[in-house]
Swiss-Prot record:
The protein, known as: Riboflavin kinase
Listed pathway(s): Cofactor biosynthesis; FMN biosynthesis; FMN from riboflavin (CTP route): step 1/1
Amino-acid positions noted as binding CDP in the UniProt annotation, renumbered to this chain: 99-104, 198-201
Lineage, uppermost ranks: Archaea, Methanobacteriati, Methanobacteriota, Stenosarchaea group, Methanomicrobia
Binding, Mg(2+): 128, 130
Family stated for the protein in its record: Belongs to the archaeal riboflavin kinase family.
UniProt keyword S-adenosyl-L-methionine, yes or no: no
Stretches for region Riboflavin kinase: 90-225
Keyword line: Flavoprotein, FMN, Kinase, Magnesium, Metal-binding, Nucleotide-binding, Transferase
Gene: ribK
Function in brief: Catalyzes the CTP-dependent phosphorylation of riboflavin (vitamin B2) to form flavin mononucleotide (FMN).
Cofactor notes: Binds 1 Mg(2+) ion per subunit.
Organism encoding this protein: Methanosarcina mazei (strain ATCC BAA-159 / DSM 3647 / Goe1 / Go1 / JCM 11833 / OCM 88)
InterPro entries tied to this protein: RibK_CTP-dep, Riboflavin_kinase_archaeal, Riboflavin_kinase_CTP-dep, Riboflavin_kinase_dom_sf, WH-like_DNA-bd_sf, WH_DNA-bd_sf
EC category name: transferase
Single biological process term from Gene Ontology: riboflavin biosynthetic process
Length: 225
């Protein structure tokens, strides 16, 4: 199990967004451990690929990796659940981002399109709304797996195999829609793709960079996984 406390201390001195220079003799003041223990634990974090570390004269240069940041995001989500009442919906907010056009291609594939219609009860517009989540919402995104979802099965059309994924029922500014999360994706974790029966950009008069709020429902469609 990674040393969460050391990750938190590194984050507090700025190692999330930049490379910081520290020495074991200085860092132990933040943790209360001896310099020797601090050096050993920092080395272990590097071994677990939670930080990047380079020894330099007078100390070491340290920056947290995406893997390390993800662990802290999960901690944030768990503490949020402990100290706040559970809302009926989970809100994710971010900014509209120009897509790569892949959504239109995949939505039009019959093996997917039929499942969307049968399981989501709407025929999706051939395209997705891509939203880059804010920092807070990016952390909360890990809670998607706790929300009701609809399973979209993978299939083979005789020529190639298409992977499966999950759809999470949402409302985007009052419009019923779904967040699509493929089992395999090359997109970063702070990006979500939304499908809807209408072109959301036109219906909500959205352009690149506009802020949009997505509400994930806690009830509904549980029996359709």
């Amino acid at each position: 199990m990674p040393d969460i406390e050391y990750l938190k201390k590194l984050a507090l001195i700025g190692a999330v967004n930049k490379t910081v220079k520290v020495s074991s003799s200085e860092f132990h003041k933040h943790t209360g451990d001896s310099s020797k223990t601090a050096a050993r634990k920092l080395k272990q974090l590097e071994k677990e690929r939670l930080i990047e570390r380079e020894l330099v004269p007078g100390g070491q240069l340290i920056k947290m990796t995406e893997k390390g940041i993800e662990i802290l995001k999960n901690e944030y989500v768990e503490y949020s659940r402990i100290f706040s009442s559970e809302p009926d919906t989970l809100e994710l907010e971010g900014n509209v981002l120009k897509g790569l056009g892949e959504g239109q291609y995949y939505i039009n594939i019959p093996g997917y399109r039929t499942q969307f219609e049968e399981k989501l009860h709407f025929i999706p517009f051939p395209g997705t709304l891509n939203v880059q989540l804010s920092e807070n919402s990016s952390a909360l995104r890990n809670r998607l797996r706790e929300m009701p979802s609809v399973r979209i099965d993978g299939f083979n059309d005789g020529e190639r195999t298409f992977g499966g994924g999950n759809c999470y029922p949402v409302r985007v500014e009052g419009i019923d829609a779904a967040v699509v999360v493929p089992d395999r994706t090359h997109y970063p974790s702070d990006l979500i793709e939304i499908i809807a029966p209408v072109k959301l950009r036109d219906a909500l008069k959205l352009k690149d960079g506009d802020r949009v709020v997505t509400q994930l429902k806690k009830q509904g469609m549980e029996g359709q996984k």
